[in-house]
């Protein structure tokens, strides 16, 4: 065969232009067809695509292209999550206008995405930094505000001194800023929050709806983040003042073992103690110093299991309401004000953290759960006892198995009026305020007369000024911009001040998938009919790093909007795939390691189709992929081999066309192309004349189409699908060596094989497929064609290989007719010369045939 090569440098841009000009990927609501919404997490416009992007988007594009060919009405959009700190940092460091910087980066990345041949409907692109998008982000904030789901309060927040902004709990990793790695400190600020805790139970409960569609790891991560705990709330009393100090515990069965209480340094009772004159000034000074030290530690640093437990005695005691015993009141680093009640009972005998704290500070240990052997002695303990046991030293509950005692202790507290059963959550309300300028402004004004006033919807958007002064110092540039800050009150018309915080960029990305359904709408964020038709997203693909952040917030938004009557779905993403990373030499790609691979360079050298093929072939999508130069070269070789196979088969294809009547109503037929139906009809008539080689190639082709269809439809086994495509290619080459294209039956068989192969490669290598489809005479794009069909009867093998075992060891392999009975299999196996020689002179105990697979012969002697 001629060494003809696929000229990707000429063909790929040409097909991209044609797809764009013809708008073949544009999509509208169509109630007559099943819909499929395929979505990749949209990128931040950093300016350059990296291989992680390419892998993510290629996975989704293959899914989208396959579903289109299967007859689905496919929504496959793209946009840019374009607010955030990198643009602002560029403005600070280089004097760039963040809007211009963002726009230029988007243009560059859009060109790169088009180079990859992705089948996006670009008319639906969304850009979160544009007014036509953030207007609706602000509108949604106002709806949350009306429902009491957006509120402002002063709270200790995570503060990044480098980024000069507040971070959500989820954005603090090991005590450091997730973006710049600076140590995070605490700061008291008035902040805006979304009341996500109001949906905690539903967010937790509805994870069950995602079983089978979402990775178990992601569901567990969200479950742990929400952190629902059932237990009891019990009120202890500060002996000196009578103040009640509530605690939350999941172990009320141990409450008789309390020997101390620990409160967070920020707890209101600490301030009261320090200002009441109840303790000496030197102790007050020590407490103040301890509080100041804690301000510079993040929650992660304070609560880490590796962190040393630090505490300070307040000098006062609390009274245990169950037994009237006194317990010392301490403050400690490991108790947080925003988890539970900010106060924790100390039971060192039955909680390891409490035990370590008691050991360090010489606090008493009291056993109240005895082990089955009855051998626990407080003075002999080297660790807390946390296993089940019998309640002791517990008043009326002595002798009760502790697990049975939990509800009894709670009931007693409720009867006595000092406690009740309750549920606590690890999840905190979502802090959305950011002291940065490059974000969606919060649509609130402050009036001395009217107080906090929401901006009327008719006045949206609250626009970002074009002339902000980005120095990187002194908080947000918005707060220093008098033209932005000073405004008039919408209620009284008097002077007012705008809110200068912007919204966390995760607010923008919590609803973008809804805007894609109706992105040009200037009257509302989306049309209800469109959003109800397209939602939920059928397949979402993105990194595992978003398991808690983005995915939890998007679920929360969807549930709130459902309750407002704006959407009907309970969950936004029916199925989730978290793709693995792209590695080089076994390590994550990074500039510092010098192991990055540029997508642009790879496209220039090998073509987009070869890059796509390698990425989909090298590893299953959920696993990490190690970039291989040999692998991409192999993919490029296969692209050319496939191209040569089809081009060399064109004479046979044209001969097959000449054998069948032309349909004058079909442009493809007139231009020399064949439809699947025409080929099938021709082969049905030619069936009596097919040779064994003809039938075998047809069997391989139909069986492989069946297998690849299952690989793509059911399990996203892209690598095995490509392996099947390679098997088809090898089978066609082998057939060509044996058969003559001028023979009528051979021409028809080859035409069928080549046509199905080109259709199957289309989702993976879209440019190559369209180029070959065009050369075969088809006037319209292959991406508008249906997925190839397969015939179950044709796919069946005439013969199968069975294994013959003797006492479990393989002794022979035999070709037998497909569909052979168990009795016939036994007879064939026993007739084997190898088997007869091995069983000669031995007693045959039994013969166990497994139809279509094996015969096991059990012998003795």
UniProtKB/Swiss-Prot annotation:
PANTHER family: LEUCINE--TRNA LIGASE, MITOCHONDRIAL, LEUCYL-TRNA SYNTHETASE. It is found in: Cytoplasm. ATP binds at residue 591. Its EC number is 6.1.1.4. It comes from the Bacteria. A motif ('HIGH' region) lies at residues 43-53. It is an enzyme of class 6 (ligase). It catalyses: tRNA(Leu) + L-leucine + ATP = L-leucyl-tRNA(Leu) + AMP + diphosphate. One of its GO terms (biological process) is leucyl-tRNA aminoacylation. This is Leucine--tRNA ligase. GO terms for cellular component: cytosol. Keywords: Aminoacyl-tRNA synthetase, ATP-binding, Cytoplasm, Ligase, Nucleotide-binding, Protein biosynthesis. CDD domains: Anticodon_Ia_Leu_BEm, LeuRS_core. A motif ('KMSKS' region) lies at residues 588-592. NCBIfam families: leuS_bact.
